[in-house]
């Protein structure tokens, strides 16, 4: 269904060189479809052209149809997609992307797995996350687009859950207790 849709500036929450692209789903201009880019929707992982009012031009992307890494110039980007317009298949592909700067799995043992669910319950396989920082970055990058996000520990127990952008587990009281404990006994936090 999303294959035939042509996205325009009306489908973007931000457009132009003044918006930051990193960590967001971006729309490539329709003219780029003929220039070798077969899709309009990509996840931006960075590049010297990804910042607002960037001096550079390179933008690094992940294709939300096939998961392949690609590069374009900033001028090819129309803007940042409105989250509510993201098609389900692209949401599933986005759920498989580890946060930019994630540690390589070859020499780091994952501590968590991240899952993102569509409203109908569909999801793709979990994503390995090596530490708390990566786990929280995964939640933040998925939150605008996904219905439900769940982080599980190595034993596959849920340690964090967000639904429709709102944290539901652990409850706020538990987080308050944890933060009070950190003030009294500083040290690593366990999710």
Q: What are these language model-derived features?
A:
Residues 1-24, 29, 97-99:
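Mixed-charge, Lys/Arg-rich low-complexity intrinsically disordered regions
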Residues 29-75:
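Basic/aromatic-rich interaction segments and small domains that mediate binding to polyanionic partners
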Residues 101-124:
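Short aromatic-glycine-(Arg/Gly/Cys) micro-motifs in beta-strand/loop hairpins
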Residues 118-121, 126-153:
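A short, charged, amphipathic alpha-helix used as a generic interaction element across diverse proteins
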